[in-house]
Amino acid sequence: MGSQTLQILRQGVWASVTGGWYYDPDQNTFVNALHLYIWLFLLCFPFTLYMALQPSMVIVGIYCGVIAAMFLLLKTVNYRLHHALDEGEVVEHQTRESKGSRGGTGGANDPVTRREDSNGLGDPGGGIEMADFIRQETPPVDCSSRNSYVGMDLNQRMSSTHGRTTVAKAPGSEETVIFRRERSTFRRQAVRRRHNAGSNPTPPTSLIGSPLRYALHEADRPSGVRSWYRTVKSQPSRTPSQVTVLSTSASLLARNGSTHLEGSQDKASTVGTTSLQDEFGTLTPSLYEIRGCHIGLGNFESATRRASNNIWDTDSHLSSSTSVRFYPHDLISLHHIRANRLLTMDPELLEQQDDLSPDLQDAPLGQDNPSAASAAGKTRQYYRLWLLPFLWVGLHFDRLTLLALFDRNREVLENVLAVVLAVLVAFLGSVLLIHGFFADIWVFQFCLVIASCQYSLLKSVQPDSSSPRHGHNRIIAYSRPVYFCLCCGLIWLLHYGSLRTTSSRFTLYGVALTSSLVLASARDLVIVFTLCFPIIFFVGLLPQVNTFVMYLFEQLDIHVFGGNASTSLLSALYSILRSIVTVALLYCFCYGALKENWEPHHIPVLFSVFCGLLVAVSYHLSRQSSDPSVLMYVPLSKVFPQLRSKNPEDPLSEVQDPLPEKLRASVNERLQSDLIVCVVIAVLYFAIHVSTVFIALQPYLSYVLYGLLGAVGLLTHYLLPQLRKQLPWYCFSHPLLKTKEYYQFEVRDAAHVMWFEKFHVWLLFVEKNVLYPLVILNELSGSARELASPKRLDTEVGALMITVAGLKLLRSSYSSPTYQYITILFTVLFFTLDHRHLSETLLLDLFLMSIIFSKMWELFYKLHFVYTYIAPWQITWGSAFHAFAQPFAVPHSAMLFVQAVVSSIFSTPLNPFLGSAIFITSYVRPVKFWERDYNTKRVDHSNTRLASQLDRNPGSDDNNLNSIFYEHLTRSLQHSLCGDLLLGRWGNFSTGDCFILASDYLNALVHLIEIGNGLVTFQLRGLEFRGTYCQQREVEAITEGVEEDEGCCCCEPGHLPHILSFNAAFGQRWLAWEVVVTKYVLEGYSITDNSAASMLQVFELRRILTTYYVKGIIYYVIASPKLEEWLANDTMKEGLRGCSERNYVDLDATFNPNIDEDYDHRLSGISRDSFCGVYLGWIQYCNSRRTKPLDSEKDSALVLLCFGLCVLGRRALGTAAHQMSSNLESFLYGLHALFKGDFRISSVRDEWIFADMELLRKVVVPGIRMSLKLHQDHFTSPDEYDEPAVLFEAISTHQQNLVIAHEGDPAWRSAVLSNAPSLLALRHVLDEGTNEYKIIMLNRRYLSFRVIKVNKECVRGLWAGQQQELVFLRNRNPERGSIQNAKQALRNMINSSCDQPIGYPIYVSPLTTSYCNSHPQLRHILGGPISFGNIRNFVVSTWHRLRKGCGAGCNSGGNIEDSDAGGLSCGTSQSSQSVQSGLVRHSPARASVVSQSSSYRYSSSRHSSLRTSTTGLEPCRRSSTSQLSLRTLPTSLQLRLGSTSDPAGPSSSLSSHSIPPCKRHTLVGLLGNDGLCSTVTDPLSQHHHPHHHPQQHNPTHATVRRDDISYRVQIVDVGQVLENINLSKRKELQWPDDAMRHKAGRTCWRDWSPLEGMEGHVIHRWVPCSRDPGSRSHIDKTILLVQVEDKIVPIIETGVIELGAEV
C-alpha cells in the first residue's frame, strides 16, 4: 500500500504538476538525468531570456528557434532510433574467452550478416520486441565510447538475400560480428490491467518471431542453401535465449494456426527440435527463456491457462467478465509477466503503447541460470543506424530504454504536429511575456506552465488524471499544449477587444457586452486560469482534446441551436455545421424581411415566409439523427447497391440480419414523410402568420396561448405521469391509473393500449405541433421589430438573434417538450408581472431562460444525488476510509454547494472521491459520457479458431453465453422504446436519463443519449445474471414493495387504505431512484435451465436418450432428399459391405447393455438382427411417409445404411466420451462434443462416412440434437412417443418450430435475433473448476419488467468516480469500498455497468436508435408516416370502399346466391360441404382463372379492406346479376359448379344445371366450353389420389368451405384470440390442413399481433357438437379462423362482429 501511494504521488501528482517529469527509481541514471536536464532547460531557458534581455521580439525569435531546433532534433532522433530498431540490422558481437583473458585473432568464428523479414514479434504494445526478452545482452546506455562505433559498410555491393553470407571482420579484432536484419510489424496493442477480462475472439494475425520465421523459410529451401543456416546455427552466437525464443515461437505458431506451419508441420517440428542446440551441443527442449530464466513451455501454458481459459483472453470488447487476468508479483515472476504480455495483446486499444509498469521494466537481472549469464556476457547486440549511404553507427540500445526516454510518435505527421505545437507554445508564451502580462513570481510560474506543456510532448503524464483508459494514451500528450494555445489566443483576443474603442455598444440585461472593463476582466480571468494549469491538470478538470471538442460542439448545438446530443466527434461536428448552415440560410430571409418597412398593423410577407420556413426546418431537424452515417446509408445503398453485398469469406455471410434493412426502411419512410409534412407545415404556418392574426388579436391571443400551453403541459407532463407512477406523489401505494397488466401474475400478450395512453399521445401531439409553434411565432411577431431597432441590437445582429432564438426554441419544443411549459410560464410571469423593466423582448427572454432552466434542473439533480448519498441515517460505509471521510466532509458543505453550482454550469459530473462522502468535480463530458465506442463482441465459432473450439471451448462461461439475451433485449427495445416513451410508459424523460430494467434474471441499465422528435438513441448495459452479493442486495431493494410497510418512526400504527405509511413515504423521498412502473411488457425469452446430470443420472435415462438418438438418425436419413444418391454411392456400398453379412456383429467396447436397447447379450455386441428387432418398425414407418417409398425390408440397402449410420453415431459418442459411457461425467462430455458438432471418426470401419460429409452435418448432428429435445419431452409424457406416428409428428413439428443448436454456433445467435419461437441448447460451463452441463430451453414470450428511473447525475457521478479511481489512482482492489452496495444510490449496479475493464457488464450494446414508426400501437393511434406508398394505399383503399358502398347502394335487394342457388345462404355451416375442393385442385382451366383473378385482386387491393383469403378464392359477394365480371367469377364458380363428396348433405345435388342460361352464356364466353365442362365434370378427381400430396401444405390449395368464406368480420376483443391453440399436442381440433395450423398462432406471427379493429375473412369455423369432425369445436364455443392480411387468427366467435358479405 505504501509503495503504491508513493507511486501515485510520484507518477500522478508530481508528474501532473511538471507535465510529465518525475524521478523514476526503476530507470537507470542516464534516463533520469536526461529527463531532468531537459525539463530544467525548458523551464530555465525562457526565464533566463526574459531576465537577461530587454523585452523585444528578439527573445521571441531566439526562444522559438532554439525550441524548434531542439524538438526537431529530439523527434528526428527518436523516430530514427525506433525505425532502426524496427528495420535496422542487428549486429551481434561474440567475444572469445581464453582462460579469463580476451585475446586472439578469432579466426574460427567468422562474422556473418543475415537479413530476415519478420512480421512477428516486433513491437507488441509499442515497445516490446524480441530483443527485449534477452536484455542481459544490452545493458543500459551511457555516454562512453563502448556503446557506439562508426564503421564503413564493406559489403555494400554484395547481395543481402537469405542464402548469402557476408563477412565483415576487422584485422586483429577480438569480437565476431553478426548482422541480422529484422523488420517487424508493429501493432498498437496493449495489455489491459484489470481484475476481470474476457476472451479474445480475434488473436493477432501474426505473432511469429524473426528466428522462427527465418527457420521456416530455411525449412523450405534446397539442401545446398540449407547448409548455410546449419553453419550459423552451429556457432555459439545463438544463445540459449535465442534458441528458446525460436522454439516457443514455433509453438505459438502452431497454436495460432498460421499458414507457414499448416503447410509444413513436419518441417516446423523439425525446426522446433533439431535446431535447438546450444553451445554445449545438448538438445534444448521447448523452453521460454527470459533473462536467464528457463521456463518449460508446458509449465508456461499451464500457468497462463490457470489465469485464463484462452491465451488471447485480453480483449476488452468481450462479454466474458469473470476470469482474472492479473499477474501479481507473488504468483508469477517478471519473466512470466513479460512472456504473457507478449502473448496477450489487445488490438482494439489503439491509443495505448506500452502498459508495462515502471517497476517491472528494469527489474534486476536474475542469476538463476549461470549458463545464460555467461552466454549474455559473450554476446552483445548493436543496431545499425545509417547516417550516410556508406556510413553507419552501431547503437548499443534497446526498445525499453528508448521508450523510457521519450514517448514514441509512430507517424511522421505526429512528429510534425509535436514540433509545431512546441514552437507555437514557445511563440505565444514568449509574446505574452514580453508584453508584460506577467510580473514578479508569476513570470516563473508562467515559465513553469510553458515547460510542462512542452515537456508533455516529449514524455507525457501516463496515466493522466483525465485519461479515460488504462495504459499509454497518445492523445493526452497533446492536451496541455492545445489548451495553452487556446488560452493564449483567447487572452490576446480579449486584450485586443478591450483596447478597441467603438461607439456601438451592445447591452443585454444591463450588461454592456462590448465594454472594455468586461473584456479586460475576462482576460484577467483567463490569465489566472492559465497560471493554474498545473493544479487544473492534476485535479483533472480538462479532458483530452477530442473529448473537449465533442463536448463544446454538443453544448453549443443543444443550448444555442436547440439540437440533440451527439454520438461521436464526427456527429458533433456534423450537427454544428448543419445548424450553422441552417441559420445562414434562414438569416437571409429574416434580414431581408427586417430591411423592409414595418407598419404597426402589418407584417412583411417575407417575414411570414421566414416564419413558415423556420417551423418546417425546425420540424425536420428535430426528426433527424445526429449521426450522418444513418442519413448517408439510404442514398448510398441506392447508388451503390454492391456496398450491401456480404463478403463471401465472412463466416456469417449466410446469416441474414433483418435489422439493417428495417432501419433503412424506417429512415427512408421518415425522409419521405418529412418531405411532404415540411411542405404542408411551411404553407400552413405561412398562411396563419400572413393573416396578421398575431397582431390583430393581441394581447388576448397571447393570454389564450399561454393558458392553453400551461394547462396542456401541466396535464401531459405532471398530472398524468404522477397518476401513472407506481407511488404517486410518494403518498399512494399503487398507481391511480392502472394498466390492464397491473394485476396479471404473468403477462401473456403485448401491452394493452389504455385510454389515458391514447390521451397522452394526442395531448403530446397537439402540444408539440400546434401550441409551441403558435406561441413561438407569436413571440417572433411581437419581438422582431423591437430587436432589430437601433436601440437594441440593430438589424444585422437582431436578425441573427431572431433566427438563432427561433430555431433553438422550436427545435427544443419538438425534441424534448417535457419541461418547456415550465420555462415559458415562468418567463412570461417573471418578465411581464415581476420585472418588466429587465425584459429584452420575450423572445430573447425565452432563449436565455431555456438555457438557465436546463442548468437549474441539472443543479437540482446534483443536489438531490448529494443529499441522498450522504444522508447520515442511510450512509453505507464501504471501507474504513468512508468512515474517516464522513465527518471531514461536513465542514466543507459550502464548498460542496459551490462545486455543485460550477459543475452544473459546465455540465460536469460531481463524483464521490473513492466512493466516500467527499465530492469533487470531474472533467467535462458529453451526454454520451464514455469516450470509447465500446461494445461487446460475443465469442462464438465465427470468431475463434477451430482448434480452440475443439480443445478449450472458448466463451463457455455463463456471462458470454448469456450476453445474447441482452442483445435480443436491445433489438426488442429498438422496436418499441421510442413508441413506449411517447405513450408515457416510462414516465417523463429527457436527454441523458438513465433507467434500469429489472426482471427475474435480466438487469439492464438503459442510457438515453439522443432524444429527437420521434427517435431515441440509447445504449443498454446488461449486468450479470448471478451478480455479486452487493448486486443482489440492490436488486432486492428495487424489486421489493413498500406497500405493506406499517412503520411510523419507531412504532407500527399502520397506514390508511391505499396510502403509504410514514416511514415508507419518508424513505422513498430519500432515494436517488424511483420505481416508474412495475409491469412494463417487452418481448423477450423466458429461460429454463435444467441440469443435464440429473436428467441423465440413471442408466435408464441414458438408454432412452440413446434410443431417441438412433431414431433421430433414422428419421433424418430417410427424410433427406439425398437418400437415393447415398444408397447408390459405390464408396458407401464398399464401406458397408462388411455390415451386410448375415452373421456380422459389431463388438466395439463402446456399446453398453445398459445404454443400447438393441444390444445382443449373446453376441456381446450389436448385430443387424438385434438392430432390426428394435428399429425396423420405425424405419418402415418413416419410409412410408416418403413421397416415393423405397424398399425397407430387413435385407434392403436402406436398412443397411441406417444400421451403419446408427452404429457410427453411437461409436462417435463413445469416442467423444473416451470409451467411458458408463461414467456420467464422460458421457456428458461426449454428448456435448457431439452436440456442438465435434465428431471424431476413430474407427476404420466408419471411414465410409467421408464419402459425403453431408451425412454428418444433415443426419447425425441433427439426430443427437433432436434426441435431447425428445428426451426432455419424455419427462412430461413418458409413453407418448411409443407410437411411431406421434413420434414422427413430434420430430416434424420440432424441426419446424424449434431451433436446436450449440450456443457457440452463429446460427444460434441468428435464431435468437430473428425471434425464433423456441430454442434448445446444451451448455457446458466450467465454474470454479467444476464442469456443469445444462439444458437451456428458450421460449419467446412477453416478459414483465420493473422500470426504475435513476437520477442521471448519480449515474454520471459514480461512473466518473470509478474511472478516476481505477485509471488514475490505480486502485485494483476487487473489494474496494466504492463498489459496495448502497441501496439509496444503487452504487454497485451503476458501477458494475461501466465500460470494461472499469466495470464488468456482460453486454454493452452499440449506440442504438429507435424510431417511433416501428411501434405498431403508436402507428395505430396516430397513423403511420405520410409517405408516398402510404398515400397511394390510402387512396386505393378509399376507392375500394367507395365502390363497395356504391354497389351496396345500387343493389336491388336481390342476391345472386338466393336467386341462382335455390336460396342457398351464405351463413349455412352445418349443411353445406366443400363444394369446390376438387374444382380447385384438378381443373386446369379453373385453376388458371383462379390464379389470375386472385393474383390480380391481391396486387390491386393488397392494402385495402377487400382482403383476399389464403384459399385464393374471392368471398361471396352480394351484388346484382348485372355486375358479374371476371373479378367475381371465381366465387360464382366455387359456389355453383362444385359437387360435394357427402351425398347426405342438402347441397349434394348442386350442379351446373342450377346456373341460369344467361349466366351460363357469360361463363362460356369467359372460359369456353372446355373450361366450363372440365370445371363442372371433374369434381371427384381428388379421390383418385389417396396418397399424401405435397400441395396440401400450401394454403392456396387447401380445402375450404363455402360458408367459411362467406362473410367478413371485425375483431373487437383481442382477449378472445387463441394464439397457442395450434401448438396443442392432443390434437383437439381437426384442421383443414397442417400448413394452416402452423400459420395460425404466435409461432408464425412473430412480431405481428392482432389488434382491435382489424378486419378479415372467415375461412374456417369449428362449431360445438358438429357431426363433421373437421368442423367440430372441442369447447362449447364456436371458433373462427379469420384471414387478416397474410396472417391467420383463431378467435372465439364472441370476439368478432360480422360485417356481412362483401360487395
Swiss-Prot record:
Entry keyword annotation includes Transmembrane: yes
Intracellular or extracellular location(s): Membrane
GO CC, alphabetical: membrane
Residue ranges of the region described as Disordered: 91-126, 1475-1556, 1577-1598
Basic and acidic residues biased stretches: 91-100
InterPro entries per UniProt: Pecanex, Pecanex_C
Source organism, top-level taxon: Eukaryota
Pfam families with a match to the protein in the record: Pecanex_C
Recorded topology in the membrane: Multi-pass membrane protein
Ranges of biased composition (kind: Low complexity): 1485-1510, 1518-1556
Residue stretches spanning the membrane: 31-53, 57-74, 416-438, 477-499, 525-547, 569-591, 603-622, 675-697, 704-721
This protein's UniProt keywords: Glycoprotein, Membrane, Transmembrane, Transmembrane helix
Biased composition (Basic residues): 1582-1591
Family: Belongs to the pecanex family.
Protein name per Swiss-Prot or TrEMBL: Pecanex-like protein 1
The organism of origin for this protein: Takifugu rubripes
Originating gene: pcnx1
